[in-house]
Amino acid sequence: MNSFIQALAQKAVELDPSFLTGRPTDIQQQQSWSRKIDIGDFSILAIGEQSHGTHEFFKARISLIRLLVKQQPVTKIGLEAPMAEVENLNTYLLSDSGDLKMILKSFQLYSYECEEFVDLVETVKIINAQHGKKISFFGFDFQSPYQVLNNLKRYGKNHELAQTVDALVSDYTQLNAYVSQHAISPDDFRSLDSLSQLVIKPLETNAKSSRIKDGFLEKNLIQYQQFLSLNDPEKNRADVQVMSQMRDSLMAQNVLREYSSGQKMILLAHNAHVQKTADAYSRTMGQFLLQAIGAMQYRCIGLTTSRGFFTAYNPQQQKITATNSVIPPHSDAFEFYFSKIAKPIFFLPTSGMTALNPDSGPDKYRLLPYGVPKNQFIRGNLLQAFDYIIHIENTTGNKSFYLH
């Protein structure tokens, strides 16, 4: 294993702590980042994270965005958030209208409701203003029905359709706890689906008969139909693996609908979605994108850590806390060996590294989904899963608005 550690040490490029501030202090520091982090060409670059609640991961992403938009003509940043709600974020970004905190609250994903994501949005706004760019956000997830139904309501040509949408929103609000867990009962789903078809079918008919294609209507119909598919008990069978693969395959389709040849875009999502190999649950969004556009066009970065804390909903305390422990890795995990090379923050290109990983070496890596899992490690080869790794030895929980 000493040879494996030596190989890691030789290939890992140590990064300055300033990289985790999200802001270079001067041009020399920016140039230093650029020399050390060589991504090369890409069409879609996905930047992952081991948890949704880590302060340093947000800051590293901000630094990467600053770096990449100077090197590549990036025009879009995709978020693991519902498509319709992210359109409101774009309105804030491009026209400075709306309440950012309320927009983030509408995502119904508490991990976005934090100081660090606000900083990321404001950084993109500054980049657009200073460099004459028009980078926009888009969502590729579809787990919320609320904004998409309100969008579809605009297209109703009669009072009956608007009433049906209002009834659906009311029903989903009452069932919200089950909606967020994809645990709608078969009877409730049949009722919701019947009402939904009264909205979907006439709007689809109108869209087909129209001479002018309405991309906004089409996108919202797709999102709502994806939401229904994911929550259909006959399709998901209450099986985590089935739901996971369905969600990742549909997220990949949503990314590809936003993508056009020659375009450069960045995706921000959990490591478990962006990695190129199957995870513990299913095939991943990254795997589907790799299959669709090829290894030279799809690239991914995994962000990892060995110790510290992360922010998440703690069921024992029944609230969101920033002191959930990142459990130090054992010798069967890749992070254990990352800690051995004495580089607190490093960038690691994984090309050529897989062959150096001995059969008796690590076969696990950390995965922290929503909440506080009892087991923080899953089986897999981290070096095969990502093109690049940025490892941050010690991390802290992000500054959630719910901590105050």
Q: What is each stretch, according to the model?
A:
Residues M1-H404:
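Structured catalytic-domain cores with a bias toward divalent-metal coordination
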